[in-house]
């Protein structure tokens, strides 16, 4: 379909009157076939593996080998202020910015994470964007895509199967019998199993379970539980690996438990790492989709930012930067967690340097941070959020200033994107603009939800200006900074804490990690709530004077991350009383899914 025809049809879509899934359904009638999209991007026919008409896997290794001497395009990260539980439109802004850069005639790509079934069927939705700034096709994107998260789940759970089988066989059999089966007794301490099972749903009743309650042949009885698949170390590995050989090596380093002599038990010790890698073989290549206006979007990996690394894959960004002049990637939640991990983990491991960071701001979130009433998903918004209130906005700007400071600490040029909502007033917008500009950030008001790329040209122009200015990108901490000092640096300089406290188990693990040589110098992946700069989701605005409580420290040797856990956050979220799955259904006449967003 010609560009003019596509634009004509887009003008018929009204996000005020239509739901996201209705817009997506209409827009999918004039998507580019993925082979056309790939050709426009500069991919050859043998570099794509089509999955239907509109989705393809891309052979990242082949493309990177072919384009190894081509310079990278401009690298842009989209982050946000601390959101309300409803989200502030970061994925929508990512799609809108990609479309806006397209309107300026730029060769542009985007990269976002694959949505987890947990939030898709729970509260937050599928993270495809919204209105006239979406990633399409919506139903496949939201409902498993090409099976990458399923592959991660199966790979992770295979390690647990191997561990459980080994515990059972060692408990039931003599050393002589084990030797006849070519097994050496590992003498695993069942009280020190580091892994749980994985499931890609929000299932709070599975956080803590007892397993193996049958007889001698029914497994090994022990406490266990489930985490959501996107919190798995295997998912983190999919985000950070750089080649198939790198992936294979990492899969053998995952620590699943400890022996009674305090030695770690790895997936390689269980001889399951090769099979785990085999399960991921088709998942290693990024997925190619498109915006509602036909720009290419890579979708790969799906870790949350509050309980995991929160980034799409390194290989997707490397691939896109060779193919486009501008590449827009997204990091999860606010700059305190998603951008901080993009900055100090993803960029450190990839060697890539960003040119600009976009901070998504809404008047709604600033009102919440300024002391507005509680925002509850599924409940009507308090009138404070839909009527003018400049005092709440002005007070809430302190949260925005904290995130601007975080981006500037990285030496990157910040662009504040005011994601415009219908209830916003000129006075509220002026306060946000003036405050951000006084903090030496560029500012753009964007209407991409309502107008698509046409509504994002001001943002796109601000981003290109920022990309063309020199920056002084640098990491928050050097690689050789001791772990305890590194945790305190993140807590003080990014979260605004006064200090850090540790539970006894966290102190014990800290001492063990610090005795493990280079392990303590692996990048630090903090786990904490996304609903506050602090560990406490009730503390809004720009809290100060608090101590960050570290309750546990996990070691992800395969991903190469040390993971301190702050506060009461869970690795398995819960399903709400009014989940999205109640509104999702299938039109039996057309076979199309309705109710997604």
From Swiss-Prot:
Record InterPro entries: Formate_THF_ligase (IPR000559), Formate_THF_ligase_CS (IPR020628), P-loop_NTPase (IPR027417)
Keyword Iron: no
Binding site for ATP: 84-91
MF-aspect GO terms: ATP binding; formate-tetrahydrofolate ligase activity
A biological process from GO: tetrahydrofolate interconversion
Reactions catalysed according to its record: (6S)-5,6,7,8-tetrahydrofolate + formate + ATP = (6R)-10-formyltetrahydrofolate + ADP + phosphate
Enzyme class: ligase
Keyword terms: ATP-binding, Ligase, Nucleotide-binding, One-carbon metabolism
Family matches, as Gene3D superfamilies: Domain 2, N(10)-formyltetrahydrofolate synthetase, Formyltetrahydrofolate synthetase, domain 3, P-loop containing nucleotide triphosphate hydrolases
Pfam families in alphabetical order: FTHFS (PF01268)
CDD domains cross-referenced by the UniProt entry: FTHFS
Known pathway: One-carbon metabolism; tetrahydrofolate interconversion
Record's keyword annotation contains Nucleotide-binding: yes
The family this protein is said to belong to: Belongs to the formate--tetrahydrofolate ligase family.
Protein's name in the database: Formate--tetrahydrofolate ligase
Gene it is expressed from: fhs
């Amino acid at each position: 379909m010609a560009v003019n025809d596509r634009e004509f049809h887009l003008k018929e879509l009204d996000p005020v009157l239509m739901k996201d899934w209705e817009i997506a359904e209409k827009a999918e009638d004039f998507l580019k076939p993925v082979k056309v999209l790939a050709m426009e991007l500069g991919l050859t026919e043998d570099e794509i593996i089509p999955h239907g008409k509109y989705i393809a896997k891309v052979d990242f290794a082949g493309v990177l080998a072919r384009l190894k001497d081509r310079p990278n395009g401009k690298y842009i990260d989209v982050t946000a202020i601390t959101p309300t539980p409803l989200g502030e439109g970061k994925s929508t802004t990512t799609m809108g910015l990609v479309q806006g850069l397209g309107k300026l005639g730029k060769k542009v790509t985007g990269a976002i994470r694959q949505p987890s079934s947990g939030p898709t069927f729970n509260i937050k939705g599928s993270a495809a964007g919204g209105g006239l700034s979406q990633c399409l096709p919506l139903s496949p994107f939201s409902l498993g895509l090409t099976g990458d998260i399923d592959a991660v789940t199966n790979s992770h759970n295979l390690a647990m199967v191997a561990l459980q089988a080994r515990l059972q066989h060692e408990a039931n059999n003599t050393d002589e019998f084990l030797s006849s089966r070519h097994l050496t007794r590992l003498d695993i301490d069942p009280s020190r199993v580091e892994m749980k099972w994985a499931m890609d749903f929000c299932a709070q009743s599975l956080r803590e379970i007892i397993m193996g309650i049958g007889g001698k042949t029914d497994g090994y009885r022990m406490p266990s539980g489930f985490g959501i698949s996107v919190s798995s170390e295997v998912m983190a590995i999919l985000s950070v690996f750089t080649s198939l050989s790198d992936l294979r090596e990492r899969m053998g380093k995952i620590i699943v438990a400890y022996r009674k002599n305090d030695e770690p038990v790895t997936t390689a010790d269980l001889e399951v790492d090769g099979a785990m890698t085999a399960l991921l073989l088709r998942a290693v290549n990024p997925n190619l989709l498109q915006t509602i206006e036909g720009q290419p979007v890579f979708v790969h990996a799906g870790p949350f930012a509050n309980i995991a690394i929160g980034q799409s894959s390194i290989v997707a960004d490397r691939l896109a930067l060779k193919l486009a002049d501008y590449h827009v990637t997204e990091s999860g939640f606010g700059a305190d967690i998603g951008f901080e991990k993009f900055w100090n983990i993803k960029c450190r491991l990839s060697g890539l340097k960003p040119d600009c960071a976009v901070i998504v701001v809404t008047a709604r979130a600033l009102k919440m941070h300024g002391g507005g009433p509680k925002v509850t998903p599924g409940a009507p918004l308090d009138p404070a959020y839909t009527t003018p209130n400049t005092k709440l906005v002005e007070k809430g700007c302190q949260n925005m200033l904290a995130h601007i400071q975080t981006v500037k600490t990285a030496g990157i040029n910040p662009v504040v994107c005011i994601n415009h909502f219908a209830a916003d007033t000129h006075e509220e917008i002026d306060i946000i603009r003036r405050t951000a500009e006084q903090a030496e950030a560029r500012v753009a008001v964007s209407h991409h939800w309502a107008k698509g790329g046409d509504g994002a040209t001001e943002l796109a122009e601000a981003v290109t200006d920022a990309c063309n200015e020199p920056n002084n990108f640098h990491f928050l901490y050097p690689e050789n900074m001791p772990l305890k000092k590194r945790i305190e640096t993140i807590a003080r300089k990014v979260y605004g804490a006064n200090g850090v406290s540790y539970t006894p188990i966290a102190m014990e693990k800290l001492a063990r990690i610090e005795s493990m040589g280079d392990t303590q110098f692996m990048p630090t992946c903090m786990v904490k709530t996304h609903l506050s700069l602090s560990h406490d989701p009730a503390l809004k605005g720009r809290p100060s004077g608090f101590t960050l409580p570290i309750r546990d420290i996990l070691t992800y040797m395969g991903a190469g991350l040390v993971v301190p856990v702050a506060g009461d956050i869970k690795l398995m979220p819960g399903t709400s009383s009014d989940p999205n799955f109640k509104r999702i259904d299938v039109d039996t006449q057309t076979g199309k899914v309705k109710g997604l967003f």
